[in-house]
Amino acid sequence: MNICLLTETQSGCYKWRGAIPAKYLSRRGHTVQIFSKQARSYEAPDVLVLYRAHYPEAVKVVEWCRKNNIRIVFDTDDALDLVPPENLNYKAVQTRLPLYETLLRAADAVTTTTEALASHLRRWNPNVTVFPNSIDPDEWTSQPRSSEVRVGWTGSPTHFADLAVALDAIREVQKKHPFQFVLQGICTESSLDEMVAVLRARFGQPLFDTPLGRSIKHFMDKLRGIRYEFHPNVPIDQHPQKVCDLKLDIGIAPLLDDPFNRHKSCIKYYEYAMSGAVTLASHVLPYSTEVPNTAKNNRESWKRKLEELLQADRTALCREQRSWVMTHRNIEKNVELWEQVFAGDQGSALPMELVSSPVEAY
């Protein structure tokens, strides 16, 4: 097949939904073209894959594909219509929703990350298939751990409100158990104080009266009294190595229970497991379907579950979690799902073991 991807090329969404599958589709003998703003020329494909809603010109491209009998696939890893006001991308997303819904309806097939999101998307298009986000094993090499216990979080600037969920427990447990708390990726500045200063200089005090600004302020207030190590965001091609270099023993994935988050996937779990860390996540969707170690979204539950993991045999737990990811969320095994739907085989259902894993009660 000649496969053309119409996408931006700088985000984690592109990495998981575009770059990783493209690499392994190429290994299977397919031609994969990345048609982005940097592209200068391309050949007419057998299938065009559109990602999210980045380019208004995509509507014209879809019309051209229709005239030339080219299969159209639309992929999204988020319910963009449910993005909350405190999300960094809220305003930008609102302007793209009409395009998002147009592309959803126009596609011959829609692909996405979880069954929850697939069910949501079927209101626009019945032909939705789940491709779980899948790691590239080539990118992950666990590093030797030191005697210092390291508990941390890695992610994007869209999680200030989510992170705040766990910080009271982190502060209390850190008083009893000596561990280093690590934060990575929530901004590009060299420190969180610099981030706040830059935002204040650029947008003024009114920013901090918005839902986003209030979530940043709440996060910074909760962080007080916690000993932490900070690492800024890195380019997407450096991210796997950066997560491994953090040498986390426990990776946390706090997440508010809201409609947008319920349609996300468990990327943090996959990354932590591949880097050699045990995951502790909020007991909410999507984590409650896959992650073995979860906590209710309150201080006492997070405190209790974190203390349990600090005293547990984390080597064995991590081995089990990494094994599950390598079995069920490995692009080497899952690339056939992409191949089948891109070729037009809508009958290829996702095996149930790829949709979810049984999780013990917390």
What are these regions (language model features)?
Residues N233-E271, A281-V291:
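Nucleotide-sugar-dependent
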Residues Q143-Q174, V182-Q184:
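Conserved donor-binding/catalytic core segment of Leloir-type glycosyltransferases
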Residues R105-W140:
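Donor nucleotide-sugar binding/catalytic pocket of nucleotide-sugar-dependent glycosyltransferases
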Residues K91-A109:
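Membrane-proximal helix-turn-helix segments that form the acceptor-binding/catalytic region
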Residues M1-P56, E194:
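N-terminal pre-catalytic "stem/leader" segment of glycosyltransferase-like enzymes
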